Amino acid sequence: MKLTMASSPHNHSHKSLTRLMLTVIAACIPGLIAQVVFFGTGVLIQLVLALVAVSVFEAAIMLMRKRPVWPALSDGSAWLTGVLLALSIPPLAPWWVIIIGCLFAIVIVKQLYGGLGFNLFNPAMAAYVLLLVSFPVQMTAWLPVTDLLNAPIGFIDQLRLIFTDFTALGFSVDQVRAGVDGLTMATPLDTVKTDVAHGLTVSESMQKPIFSQWAGLGWLWVNLGFLAGGLYLLKAKIINWHIPVSFIGSLALCSAIGYIAAPGTEPGMVFHLLSGATMIGAFFIATDPVSAATTNKGRLIYGALIGLLVYLIRTFGGFPDAVAFSVLLINIAVPLIDYYTQPRTYGHGAVK
């Protein structure tokens, strides 16, 4: 019998790629539960659509490339992309929005560059930006939390809104949104940005019913849910601490400085940290091992730059939330960051 020796390392952690991906997906569950509680079961419908779509597109591309289908599907990377995209779009977005996003994420961003490990950008965020730029109306159709709705939308009506654009009584998403005390803005970040532009102070804006004491009603708990999941990933050593800590620290520092400089028009540190996609961005998106920086020093720089861009775009840009744009922009800089932060090889110090 011929024996062969595999290449090193021979001692490993027994953490397969599939197990890592499924662990990250499981860590999304607290944030997912918070979204379902505060924004309805539409997010579950989007999640099912996304998982089916990414599986179909991944399998189709593997067949076209004459590669084995099951190994590509079973590694879980496509499923994680679908989960992150489904959690990022409005729960009642039309069904074709998530399908187009999954098509772009898997076929263009991931497989066109060679598949897992070769994509330059985070597939879920690249797809999110494509959808936001191409379909801004559908991608900003966030409903207020269910407690503020005059008539809570049941599962069947949410299903009808996603697939037909209307409830059983003939109401569209826009009509449902406009029925909540005249509120038509999508998220707390939207509301503060618009109100400040119209001359209101932050404290006046936050008197509206969509806000809680610290941040947007519902969004605070969604972010805390993703924070809990992110802390679990850190404890399980699935991700390193450098990127989320530098991301959150940079955003906290910038927002604190902004609040000190202009307390009337800047919402402050806690609001920035617990609104929008801050926590899912810090722990689940920016930490993508393929498109993020690879050295510890580089990860600190990478995360800090993303946090800085999130603050700048939220404050001075045209989009209220900026995590996706910030991650993609710093993805471009990753080769440069890695080049200048490579650790010095022992025995090859600089010549004096």
Model-assigned labels for residue ranges:
Residues 81-154:
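A generic, well-ordered mixed alpha/beta core segment in the N-terminal half of proteins
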Residues 41-53, 92-101, 209-223, 266-278:
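Structural signature of hydrophobic alpha-helical transmembrane segments
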Residues 120-125, 269-278, 299, 317-330:
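Loop-to-transmembrane alpha-helix initiation sites
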Residues 8, 56-68, 106-117, 227-238, ...:
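C-terminal ends of transmembrane helices
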Residues 69-80, 98-101, 118-129, 241-249, ...:
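Cytoplasmic-side transmembrane-helix entry/capping segments in multi-pass membrane proteins
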Residues 1-63, 347-350:
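N-terminal signal-anchor module of multipass membrane proteins
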Residues 123-224:
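Long hydrophobic alpha-helical segments that form multi-pass transmembrane helix bundles
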Residues 1-20, 313-352:
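Cytosolic-side transmembrane-helix boundaries in multi-pass membrane proteins
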